[in-house]
């Protein structure tokens, strides 16, 4: 029997009603109350997520910037201390190793946050391409990560920190913020389409912060949230999930994150030639939104057709809790990607009518 990995918060899941599942080798809560309730809490109030399964890698040394410029697609030279950047790592053929966040903690000190299912693969990829004076260290087991997301997230977190959180702008962070007296890196980032913060602390401090936030957030309807709501929230906001919208066979351009690919940066990086070609002349496939007109919910890998031609497949799909519609993301042949194009999805051996619609499906009002 495979032993599932657990985060430092595992022991408190049951106290809050957490129902765990095997998520890529991790025993994680899929929900605490219900996916729908948790989803709505984040859209209207706030939700607290344990995302400690995510990986963290420290990159330091005099050549750390040159190294990162070679292995990621975005332009890290534009990042200032206290800034965060979304980027991708690619293979030479343009396929995606992973998508990640980079935090610049010092002139020669970067923290990379990578997907849980890719920790070993990413670390080996990074370590195998180290240049000069660069040190790459996997610190995933030492760091826990919590995410507090939703319109009331700032107000709740503000109750337990002395720093003025309004000073931490979107995709910025502060190191050594005291959260209920515990030092943590606090960044204004997230994976839900809402305002919110991600909190990185020592693994042994995670339970104390989790319980304190739920205690002070109770009057503002803060709910503990699981992976189910995390997935429906990120999906509505059209944020890609590695293994579905991104993979070794899907480039960042096709997945709609071309903004994180800077082919005009001086540094040569893995996949640059292919990605430059796709950026300038278009990629053969495109990730599009689809709305099902008839009955049925599109799910990952369901084939998409126009007539008898298979034009691609669904990458993610659900009954949207916010929009109350059956919607999906699909990677399809670019010639069928125009808005309002009618397509068919094969759901349980039956063709169901759908139409290409704009994304993101959900965008919060400022």
From Swiss-Prot:
Keywords: Aminotransferase, Transferase
Subunit structure: The glycine cleavage system is composed of four proteins: P, T, L and H.
Catalyzed chemical reaction(s): N(6)-[(R)-S(8)-aminomethyldihydrolipoyl]-L-lysyl-[protein] + (6S)-5,6,7,8-tetrahydrofolate = N(6)-[(R)-dihydrolipoyl]-L-lysyl-[protein] + (6R)-5,10-methylene-5,6,7,8-tetrahydrofolate + NH4(+)
Organism: Bacillus cytotoxicus (strain DSM 22905 / CIP 110041 / 391-98 / NVH 391-98)
Enzyme class: transferase
HAMAP family per UniProt: GcvT
GO MF annotations in UniProt: aminomethyltransferase activity; transaminase activity
UniProt family annotation: Belongs to the GcvT family.
SUPFAM superfamilies with a match to the protein in the record: Aminomethyltransferase beta-barrel domain, Folate-binding domain
Function: The glycine cleavage system catalyzes the degradation of glycine.
EC code: 2.1.2.10
Protein name: Aminomethyltransferase
Keyword Transferase: yes
One Gene Ontology cellular component annotation held by this UniProt entry: glycine cleavage complex
Domain of life: Bacteria
Keyword Ligase part of the UniProt annotation: no
GO terms for biological process, alphabetical: glycine decarboxylation via glycine cleavage system
């Amino acid at each position: 029997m495979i032993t599932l990995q657990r985060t430092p918060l595992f022991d408190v899941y049951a106290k809050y009603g957490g129902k765990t599942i095997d998520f890529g080798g991790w025993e994680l809560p899929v929900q605490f109350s219900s996916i729908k309730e948790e989803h709505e809490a984040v859209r209207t109030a706030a939700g607290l997520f344990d995302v400690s399964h995510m990986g963290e890698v420290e990159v330091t040394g005099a050549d750390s910037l040159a190294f990162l410029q070679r292995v990621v697609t975005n332009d890290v030279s534009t990042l200032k201390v206290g800034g965060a950047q979304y980027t991708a790592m690619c293979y030479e053929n343009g396929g995606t190793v992973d998508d990640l966040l980079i935090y610049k903690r010092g002139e020669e000190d970067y923290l990379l946050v990578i997907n849980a299912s890719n920790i070993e693969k990413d670390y080996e990829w990074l370590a195998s391409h180290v240049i000069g004076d660069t040190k790459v260290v996997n610190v995933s087991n030492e760091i826990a990560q919590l995410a507090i997301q939703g319109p009331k997230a700032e107000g709740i977190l503000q109750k337990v920190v002395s720093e003025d959180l309004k000073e931490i702008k979107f995709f910025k962070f502060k190191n050594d913020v005291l959260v209920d007296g515990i030092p943590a890196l606090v960044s204004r980032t997230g994976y839900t389409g809402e305002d919110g913060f991600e909190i990185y602390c020592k693994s042994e401090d995670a339970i104390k912060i989790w319980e304190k936030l739920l205690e002070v957030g109770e009057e503002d309807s803060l709910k503990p949230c699981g992976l189910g709501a995390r997935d429906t929230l990120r999906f509505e906001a059209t944020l890609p999930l590695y293994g579905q919208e991104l993979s070794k066979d899907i480039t960042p351009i096709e997945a709609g994150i071309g903004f994180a690919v800077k082919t005009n940066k001086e540094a040569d990086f893995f996949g640059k030639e292919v990605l430059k070609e796709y950026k300038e002349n278009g990629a053969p496939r495109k990730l599009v939104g689809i709305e099902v007109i008839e009955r049925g919910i599109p799910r990952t890998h369901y084939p998409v057709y126009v007539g008898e031609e298979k034009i691609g497949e669904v990458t993610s799909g659900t009954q949207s809790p916010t929009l109350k519609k059956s919607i999906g993301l699909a990677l399809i042949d670019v010639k069928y990607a125009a808005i309002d194009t009618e397509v068919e999805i094969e759901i349980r051996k039956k063709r169901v009518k759908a139409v290409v619609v704009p994304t993101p499906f959900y965008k919060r009002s400022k």
